[in-house]
C-alpha cells in the first residue's frame, strides 16, 4: 500500500474516514502489524473530546455517524468532524466501498472493533443496515470531498471494495 508513506512520517496526523464496515480498522491494523503505528496512537472519533489533549495521530471516523446523528447526508452538519478537521497537519484517507458490498459486510459482521478492544462488543447490525439503506452515499461523499477541498486538506480516496485498497478519484464515486 502506498498509503504507508504518509503513516511513516510520525509528524503526520491522519484521519481514516468511511462508512461502517468499509475497512478503516483493517487499514489501521495493517499499519500496526507493519510497525508503522501502535494502538495508543489511534483515537476513535467518539473518544475525541475525551483524549484530544493526548498525543494521538490517527483518527478512526465512521462516515455514517453524520447521518445517524443529524439525519442528513450533508457532512457540513457534523460538528465533531469539524473539530477534527482543525488538526494540523492532517491527511485524510477516504474509504469507499460500493453499497452492495458494504451491505453484505454489515449483514455478516458480529463484533465492533474486536482487534482494537480485544472484547466481543456486539455489532448493531440491524441499526447499521437501516442507516446504510437510508443514507445518500453519493451526497455524503460529495459533501465530504467538497469540505476537504474548501479547507485545503490533502486526501486520497481508496476503493476498499476489495482487499487491495486501490487509489481512485472522486469521479468513480459520483
Spans of features found by a protein language model:
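Extreme N-terminal, non-catalytic leader segments
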Residues: 1-13
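NTP-dependent small-molecule kinase module
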Residues: 2-5, 135-174
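Hydrophobic anchor at the beta1->P-loop junction of P-loop NTPases
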Residues: 16
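The conserved Walker
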Residues: 20
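Walker A/P-loop
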Residues: 25
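Conserved substrate/cofactor phosphate-moiety recognition/catalytic segment
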Residues: 28-73
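Short secondary-structure capping micro-motifs at structural edges
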Residues: 74-84
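A glycine- and Lys/Arg-enriched "phosphate-lid" helix/loop adjacent to the NTP-binding pocket
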Residues: 85-144
